[in-house]
Swiss-Prot record:
The lineage of its organism: Bacteria, Pseudomonadati, Pseudomonadota, Betaproteobacteria, Burkholderiales. PANTHER family: GLUTAMYL-TRNA(GLN) AMIDOTRANSFERASE SUBUNIT C, MITOCHONDRIAL (PTHR15004:SF0). Belongs to the GatC family. GO terms for biological process: glutaminyl-tRNAGln biosynthesis via transamidation; regulation of translational fidelity; translation. It catalyses: L-glutamyl-tRNA(Gln) + L-glutamine + ATP + H2O = L-glutaminyl-tRNA(Gln) + L-glutamate + ADP + phosphate + H(+); L-aspartyl-tRNA(Asn) + L-glutamine + ATP + H2O = L-asparaginyl-tRNA(Asn) + L-glutamate + ADP + phosphate + 2 H(+). Transmembrane segments: none annotated. The keyword ATP-binding applies. The gene is gatC. NCBIfam families: gatC. Heterotrimer of A, B and C subunits. This is Aspartyl/glutamyl-tRNA(Asn/Gln) amidotransferase subunit C.
Amino acid sequence: MALTLTDVKRIAHLARLELADAEAEHTLVQLNDFFGLVEQMQAVDTTGIAPLAHPIEQIEDVALRLRDDTVTETVEREAFQRPAPAVQDGLYLVPKVIE
């Protein structure tokens, strides 16, 4: 899927970006290179290959050091709200800003 200069200018307009002609041409080359890489990756036959959550796990010398998913913090709402000038039902009371 190759983009044209018109496509790049239209995308820039939709994104509310102002691109000079030189910038648009440079962006066109970069985007087409990117889409070419994506097409190459899509052409690879991955039948029978399980997806990896962490590709680095396939390297034998490196072990993932993931911590246990445990609660390590406690709720300290009362301690944090103690110095507040006004609190009600666990919420901070502030002056009305918008009328």
